[in-house]
């Protein structure tokens, strides 16, 4: 939860003992601090995020809602993960990761009042000359993401992750949240002889990136 675009800022990682987001507690925190902007998103949360709940929390305190969907954008394009676009004021994402595009990003918004501010903040604020090859690569990325083949791909990505989560549990490895709705699996290694870093190195050598 971001308490202001300029000024104090709070990062809230709120979940219950199962690792699931506790929206009631997030609402209590928002009511306590009255943020101007709430930023919702995750890099290590395997379940569906309730974007409507975040919208309602933001509205209850008069905050803007910004969503970072970088890790889920490909699954959202593939219609296997809920989209934040109907609920957020502004949405940001990378174009690589699950969207399979070139390294880069995008910003989406649904109100004309944001257009001038966002555009001027990007150029000339933070960006110089655009790379035309990257723009072309992004266009191709979006074309592919709008195909039935990409939807099939996204569906299979989630099925593969869910199958892996089940197998890990069968081998006695605790999977946080009890499974996954996405491409992300979180495991609890507190009772393991391996640290998180050691496990990540072993997995990377076998073609699985952590």
Predicted segments — roles?
Residues 52, 56, 60-63, 167, ...:
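Glycine-rich ThDP/TPP pyrophosphate-binding loop and its adjacent helix/strand module
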Residues 88-194:
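Active-site C-terminal subdomain of aminotransferase-like
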Residues 43-46, 71-73, 97, 181:
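Active-site-proximal loop/turn and secondary-structure-junction residues that shape catalytic pockets
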Residues 1-12:
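Single conserved hydrophobic/aromatic residue that forms the stacking wall/gate
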Residues 205-210:
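Conserved PLP cofactor-binding pocket of PLP-dependent enzymes
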Residues 9, 36, 89:
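Conserved acidic residues
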Residues 15-69:
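Active-site phosphate-binding strand-loop segment of PLP-dependent enzymes
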